Every structure is written in C-alpha cells, then in structure tokens.
Curated annotation (Swiss-Prot):
It comes from Saccharomyces cerevisiae (strain FostersO) (Baker's yeast). The modification Phosphoserine is found at S29, S73, S115. This is Spindle pole component BBP1. Disulfide bonds: none annotated. Residues 34-76 are annotated as: Disordered. InterPro entries: Bbp1_C, Bbp1_N. Pfam families: BBP1_C (PF15272), BBP1_N (PF15271).
Length: 424
C-alpha cells in the first residue's frame, strides 16, 4: 500500500492527482474521448488520441480554430463562384436549388464533398460537464507570458458540474476519511470506467446496495460499448493504415516516375545546352569571320582608292612623259635636219676642197713639167732644194722665208695623192 502511495497509482495520492488533473486540465477524460462515437460512423470521424483535443474550440468569434482543411477541386463552389464563372447551380430531386431552398441534408452533403475527409474530426467538442481534462485546458487563449510562468494557472471548475459536485460532496469526503482503506484507481471517476470488482482487502466493510448493482450494470454496458467502438476504430485505423500504405506506395511510384522524367529532362537539357554552346561558338566564329571580312573589305576599299589615285597620277605622269617624248622627238628631228644640213654642207666643202686640190695638182704637175724642161734629168724629189708655190687656204699658209708647207696640208695632200694613185 505504501508503494502504491509512492508511485501515485491509487489511494489518496491518486485522488489528489485526479483532482489536480480535473481542475487544471492536464489530461483528457476517456469518457469524453469516446463520447457519441456510435453516432459518428463516417470514416472522416475517428476517435483519436489526446492530440485531437489540443485545438481551440468554442463559440467565441475571437478564438482562432486550428482545424485546417485541405483544398481540393470542390473548394469554393458557392453561389459567388457560380455567378463569377456563369455556372448552373445544383438542384435537388424536385428540381429546385437545394442550397437556396435551405435543404439541410443537401448542404451537409455538398459541404462534405467540397471538403476532404480530415483525419482529425472537424466538429467542435461540446461543453460537456464531464470533460474535466483536455477541453478546459484549451478553452482559454494562453499568452506566452502565461506559458512561460512556472506556476500552474488557476482554472476554476464549472458551477453546474455534477461530477465535481459529487466528487467534492461532504458526505463522500467524510466517508472516504472514515474509511480505513484507501481508494483504488478504479474508484476515481475520469479514468477508464470499469465495473466495480470485489475488493478482497476490505473485510465486508461496505455492502453494495441495489443502486451500486445498477451502476455496475451500466458500467458494464458502457464498457462493452467502448470495446465495440474501439473495435470499429481499430478496423477503421487498419483501413486508414492500408490507405496510407497504398498512398505511400503510389507516392514512391510517382516519385520514381518524376525522377525518371527529371533525369530525361535533365539529359535533354544538357544536350540542348551543348547544342546551344556549339551554336554560340559557331556564331562567335562566324562573327569573327564577318569582322575580318569587313576589315578586309574596308582595306580593299582604301586600297582601291589609293590605286585610283595612283592610276590618276600615272596617267598624269604618262601625259607628261608623252609630252616630253614629243618634245624630244621634235628636237631630234630638228637635230637630224641640222645634221643633214651640216652633212650636205660638209660634202659641199669636201667637193670644193677636192676641186681645189685637183686644181693644185694640175698646177703642180704643170710646174713639174716646166721644171723638167728647164733642168734635164733633175728630179724634183732629189736631195737638193726645190721651190714650192705659195698656197693660202684657211689656216694652211706658206712661209716665204723657210719655204715649207704646213703639216696638215701635207697630210691632206698625201692622202689625196694616194687616192689619185689608187684611182689611176
């Protein structure tokens, strides 16, 4: 019994622990957890663990609900959407608009179709007096300062809470105080309800009356109902796990498909990038060639301009040279004419000279003949002196004192004499 007190599994310490949990909302009541589960047979409503009751519920408009539903293809299909996209409204079997006519079942059906099936129940918890744990913990919006405070906030119970009123009844408390035995965990409400079993440790201290038997039967019925509901919940949980497993397998298949498509798209993108790189390189090389050709064209144009200038200059120089050639030709012709005239004049002078020489030779021969007659047997070319006729011709002159001929005249005379001998 002392060990049970130390561990807090039962007795007065267990009662104190349950009272603290009932007052300050540190846990959830199993009776509230599985309450009204027979009415909610839909798969979207499950009896979940304590996390379902960690939301903020209530009718206060300032409170923000954490029940977020997923969006699907049915979301937003209200009258505003029908008017916006010019859609026909939904009609019931009688041909009237079910939403406009206020058909509650049609509204619920459409609302259930428009919203996906949530794992967490969407209906807010009712303000039941037996909910002494999780619901009261989250009915008040607690700030960060309150959460950071080490002290446990004081939350008073409801005034019309029959469970707490019965729990803190003076007769019951006095009875517990008078009892030499400590209460067990099974006797404390708020935990899993179970039939009252016989306590062997109590030696016929308390005899159960008919009310206790009736309560025992009610506990058994509720207990079996809870087991049946737990069985249904277990089946639904298995179905949910199966659905989750199938969705996970489908997710893996989709992931493999997306991965393969990503690899193919990535390979295609790499090929496109390579082609783009090759195209850019070709475009760059073509641009360089275009620049070089344009530069060569500019150089060619400049060279052509220079060539045209050079050609014009050459034409001018050619004209100048032609003029000089014409001038030189004219001068040459003049010189040739002058040379011809001089040659003719020279020939005439030579003829004159020859005629004079011939006359002189005749005179010389006549004188020689006369001398032969005067001096017989004498030779005009002997070693003795002989007279020479004075002859004046330009620069050739005869000196009367020396009786000698000019040297040039003698040379010319000898040449003429030689010519005459050859002719004869």
């Amino acid at each position: 019994m002392n060990q049970e007190d130390n561990t807090g599994g039962g007795g007065i310490f267990g009662l104190f622990k349950w009272t603290k949990x009932a007052l300050f909302g540190t846990d959830i009541s199993p009776s509230m957890k599985y309450k009204d589960q027979e009415e909610r047979r839909d798969r979207s409503r499950y009896a979940q663990d304590d996390t379902n009751f960690s939301m903020k519920f209530g009718n206060d408009s300032n409170r923000r609900s954490t029940n977020l539903s997923r969006s699907n293809s049915w979301s937003g299909l209200d009258s505003t959407l029908h008017r916006k996209y010019e859609l026909l409204p939904e009609y019931n079997e009688n041909g009237f608009n079910s939403i406009v006519n206020g058909d509650h079942h049609s509204k619920e059906r459409i609302r259930s179709l428009r919203s996906p099936a949530p794992i967490v129940p969407r209906e807010p918890l009712r303000n039941e007096p037996t909910d002494t744990f999780g619901h009261r913990l989250h009915t008040k919006r607690r700030t960060i300062n309150e959460l950071s405070n080490s002290q446990i906030p004081f939350i008073p119970p409801q005034e019309d809470d029959p469970l707490l009123s019965k729990l803190f009844n003076k007769d019951g408390v006095n009875e517990v105080r008078r009892s030499p035995y400590k209460l067990s965990v099974k006797d404390i409400p708020g935990k899993f309800p179970s039939p009252l079993t016989k306590r062997d440790e109590i030696d016929n201290y308390y005899v159960r009356d008919e009310d206790a038997c009736h309560k025992n039967r009610e506990y058994k019925k509720a207990y079996f109902d809870l087991f049946a509901q737990m069985d249904l919940n277990s089946r639904d949980l298995e179905d949910l796990c199966e659905d989750v497993r199938e969705q996970r397998e489908q997710f893996h298949r989709n992931e493999q498909t997306y991965k393969q498509a990503y690899e193919e798209m990535r390979a295609e993108l790499v090929n496109e990038l390579k082609k783009s790189k090759t195209l850019f390189e070709n475009y760059y090389s073509l641009g360089q060639k275009y620049k070089s050709l344009k530069k060569x064209l500019d150089q060619t144009i400049s060279h052509e301009a220079e060539l045209a200038t050079s050609r014009e200059r050459l034409y001018q120089e050619e004209d100048l040279k032609n003029f000089e050639i014409q001038t030189l030709k004219q001068r040459l012709s003049d010189l040739e004419l002058k040379y011809t005239n001089l040659q003719i004049e020279k020939d005439m002078q030579r003829d004159n000279y020859e005629s004079e020489i011939h006359d002189l030779l005749l005179q010389l021969s006549l004188r020689n003949n006369e001398r032969k007659d005067t001096s017989a047997g004498s030779n005009i070319f002997s070693t003795g002196q002989y007279d020479r006729t004075p002859f004046h011709n330009g620069n050739n002159s005869y000196d009367s004192n020396s009786h000698s001929w000019d040297t040039d005249y003698l040379k010319k005379y000898r040449r003429i004499h030689r010519t005459l001998k050859q002719k004869s």
